[in-house]
Amino acid sequence: MKEILITNDDGFEATGLLALKETLSELDGVNVTIVAPSSEKSACAHSLTLTRPLRFIKLDDGFFKLDDATPSDCVYLALHALYNKKPDLVISGINHGANLGEDITYSGTCGAAMEGVLQGIRSIAFSQFYENNSLNELGFELAKEIVKFIVPKVLNDEISLNQREFLNVNIPATTSKNFKGYAVVPAGRRTYATHATLNRNPRGIEYYWLGNAALEYEKGEPSDISKVNEGFATITPIKLNMTSYESLESLKGKFDAK
């Protein structure tokens, strides 16, 4: 029996999480445990909660929410409190919205997959791209098909993952009929419009809402951004080693010991 731990950053009631649960339950020889945040934690990246205690709340057999926790908390604590041995796979998602290019650095969905990798477990992040508030209309039917295609291949070692890397999978905003297939591509680069909106509460105290909208992406070589917009499911292996090897040698010359 293969053990899979799943979490997300949209919260324990999110449609994408429940679609993932339903899909994995249909696979033979798989046991699924869910530990998800009690509320939405989008854009919390790979943060851990170190300044207050965390509490499991059991919702059903194998289904827990973690009170006011991050996705990385969910993975970290599940591995230490619920498992006697490590699960075979950590899956984060299905996220409500894509995680493309530099989105990965903000993403709580990808942060949970990173935590799985740091704990020595193969990990996948699944995200559903959508446009113009079409997620309710679009649904997760194509995403469920893609999960069913990829997950068994990872569990059966048809797809091998190197240590300290995870798969970032983005599902296009299209139907099964118009699905173009799979594209293994690098993460792209996007230009963002950042802004902060100033407001005042009834007592006159100022506060801000942060905003972050993607304007366009850099054209050129195929990337996760270009291909998901063309109707492909994109698969990008993400390494946790963030060293810039291109700059190592030139920097060494600037800091040679006297």
Short names for language-model regions:
Residues 98-107:
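Glycine/threonine-rich flexible loop motifs
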Residues 4, 18-81, 85-86:
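A cross-family phosphate/adenosyl-ligand binding-site feature
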Residues 7, 35-37, 92-95, 126-127, ...:
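Short beta-strand segments
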